[in-house]
Each structure stands twice: as C-alpha cells, then as structure tokens.
C-alpha cells in the first residue's frame, strides 16, 4: 500500500469494474437549484425525490454474485449549475464494526469506504476517481487507459460521512471544474460505484451506470 490509497489495489479494482458486467445499467438524475448542505443527512427535498441506484454485486471475492439485503447499497445523484452531487446509503447490520480510522488526506488506513469513478465522455478512456472513507477521509486519483493511475492528482471537492444505526452515509459534491466532459447541452456520463467492506470478508462491491444530465445548457463558469 502506498500513501495514495494503493495504486496496485486501484488497478485491480479497475479491471474488475470493467469486466464484471457487459451490460451497463442506467439511472436518471435531475437538476437541483436547492442549496445542498454536504452534511451526510440527505434531507433536502431534491434527495428525497431522486431515483435510487441499487443492484450492486460482489467484485471480490465472488465476482458477480448478488449482495445480501443486509449489506445493500443505495446511491442517488443530483446535479446543479456547477457540480454533481452523490448521496450513498451503505447498509451494515453491525454499524459498530464499521472501520473508520482517522488518517491524513489521500490515505485509506483501515477504513470502509465508498467511491465513484466518473468518465465524462463515457468512452472508457479516462476516469476521475473520488473515494470517501467512513471517517470522511478523502482520496482522489486520475486514471487513463494509456497511463494508468495518477496518484499525484488532487482536486478540490467536498464530502461528509456519518455512521448511522443502519450503516453509514456518504455525501459528495464534485465541482465540474474537477472533471472533463464535452461542451454540449445533453451529457451522458459513464459511472462506476465502488464500496469496500473490510469487516464483511473484505468484499468489494460495484455497479456500472450511465447517467444523462439534461438540460445542461451553458457550460458553467468556474
């Protein structure tokens, strides 16, 4: 493991994500004009109305197998004029066993975590990867098919994480300034979501999604 969350682990995870499912799922999202507070509460009206992405499957150790209901993951996505928002509920029947070591930025330590890989061109060539641990530690990297993982890349983004009675919640706000995507009104992005459960036999869970952002008029000014 390196301080940048483990380049070797990231590369292995990427190969699993690109191979475990040939059929990509899709989920709709919508634009919000609310002031979304990044507090891991997900209590704004926009979150309550957003579509839930589920159907996570195991990537390790049993690739492609369904996730038990007690460990289900639910993800919602919103976007505004300047950022994309991700809200995730990560269920665990034993929340007291969720690992949440406090470490420096870009270090994982011994923690459960949730992450999103964003491909703004939906072409499989480049991904910006953002991870949040159960202790609200942030890790970000840039991956390209030509160069592999760039652990030195850092972006400015917001996150929060909170342990609950059903598991834990992660909320993220990623400004468009941290991403790359085409300049057009209607956007179609490819996303991979990833969850690591240390206590649950070190399972790695994932789901591939396509999202459409429309209307997406006038490229935001940063």
Positions of the model-derived regions?
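Bacterial Sec-dependent N-terminal signal peptides
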Residues: 1-25
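Structural preference for beta-rich elements and adjacent junctions enriched in aromatics
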Residues: 20-222
